[in-house]
A protein has these predicted regions:
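N-terminal secretory signal peptides that target proteins for export/translocation
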Residues: 1-2
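Selective for proline/serine-rich intrinsically disordered segments
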Residues: 16-18, 78
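Bacterial N-terminal signal peptides
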Residues: 5-16
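Short Cys/His-rich "knuckle" micro-motifs
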Residues: 148-149
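The canonical Cys-X-X-Cys-His
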Residues: 133-144
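Boundary of Sec targeting at the N-terminus
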Residues: 17, 23-24
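A short hydrophobic/aromatic micro-motif that marks alpha-helical segments and, especially, helix-coil
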Residues: 17, 112-113, 137-138
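Extracytoplasmic c-type cytochrome modules immediately beyond a signal peptide or single-pass transmembrane anchor
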Residues: 24-134, 152-153
Length: 153
């Protein structure tokens, strides 16, 4: 259980932490589009985590999970080959392992839909589905996202 809590906590920090100051201002084109989309996903995920951590307003998790699921099918389209110009955090491994990347993006959609359909009155089931969404995010970010450099904010 401690491992699960640690994994969820680390993922929450990974997803909810804001980008370095000015990161989006230098992004253009598809890189900017995907950074903005990922920022929206992080916003919805933060809302979900706050509700689960507080064990309140759990029925409203559905809308945030549906929003994440709606973004997920667009992930692969926002990573055309060669779109690595800074401030992109995309690794070349995405295009070297394209089928795996697509599967991981699809897993986010699948797990987000399961979370949206989870019974808000069954906290254990809801938490389990939230962990599955966390694992979908981590699986992709660990392999395909460069680590952020610590910058002054």
């Amino acid at each position: 259980m401690r491992y699960s809590a640690l994994l969820v906590g680390m993922t929450w920090l990974l997803l909810a932490s804001p980008p370095p100051l000015g990161a989006h201002e230098h992004a253009t084109g598809v890189v900017k589009e995907r950074m903005e989309m990922m920022q929206q996903v992080a916003k919805h995920w933060k809302s979900i985590r706050e509700r689960i951590d507080a064990k309140r307003d759990l029925e409203s998790i559905k809308a945030d999970a549906e929003a994440i699921a709606a973004h997920a099918p667009h992930i692969a389209h926002l990573f055309p080959k060669g779109s690595t110009q800074k401030p992109s955090e995309a690794r070349a491994a995405i295009w070297q392992n394209w089928p795996d990347f697509e599967r991981k993006a699809a897993a986010l959609e699948t797990e987000s839909k399961k979370l949206a359909n989870a019974d808000p009155n069954d906290f254990d089931a809801l938490s389990a589905e939230a962990r599955a969404v966390t694992q979908a995010c981590v699986a992709c970010h660990e392999k395909y996202r460069s680590k952020r450099r610590k910058e002054t904010r």
